[in-house]
Amino acid sequence: MFDMATKTKKITKKNIAIDKEVVKALDIDHLKALSLNPHDWHESGTCEYRLYAYLSTFFKGTTILDVGSRTGGSALALSYNEENQVISYDLVEQGASSIKRDNITWKIQDFRDDDTLDYDNISIIMIDVDPHDGKQEEEMFEFLEEKGWKGLVLLDDIGPLWPDIEDFWNRITFPKLDVSDVGHMSGTGAVSFDSKHKLSWK
C-alpha cells in the first residue's frame, strides 16, 4: 500500500508457515472453558480460534491486539501462548471483561487512541469490527501505515457473505494468505503488513 520509512523493530522477521494438521489438532479446551459462548468453539474451518491460538506461538514476549472484543472469544484464542500479552478493545462492553486471564487486558476505547501502546512490540493485530463495511478496516490500515508498523494482521469475514470486507481484502497489496481452510467459515485472511513476515502453507 503506502511506502513507509524503514524503522528498526524489536520483533524479527518470521517465516510463518501454517501447518493445517497442527492447527486442526491444537487443544484449546482450557480456553473454551473460560468462554462466555463455548458452543461457538467449533473445529477449524468453521471457527477461527485454533488458528489464532496457533499463530500466537510464532511470537514470544510480545503484545497482541484484539480489535473488536465482543464476548472475548478471539482474545482468549490469541492468549494461548502465555508468554504474550493480549490487549482487547471494544467501544461498548459486551461481557468480555468478566473473563479473567492473566495475559489479557480488556479496554473500552478505540485502539488508535491508546497512547500507552509500544508499536515496536506489537506482533499481531486481529481486526473484526462492526458494521463490516470495509471502511473502518481501511482507516485502521491507513493509521498503521502512518505509524510505520510492521507485523501480522488477521481479518475475519473476508468471504462473499460480507462483500464489503471481501472487496477490501481483494484491494490489499501487502503479501496476504487466505487461511479460511483452518479459519472461520465466513473467511479469514492473514496479511503481512508492510511485508514484515513471509506467509505460506507448510
Please provide the spans of the model-predicted regions.
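A short alpha-helical cap/connector motif
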Residues: M1-K202
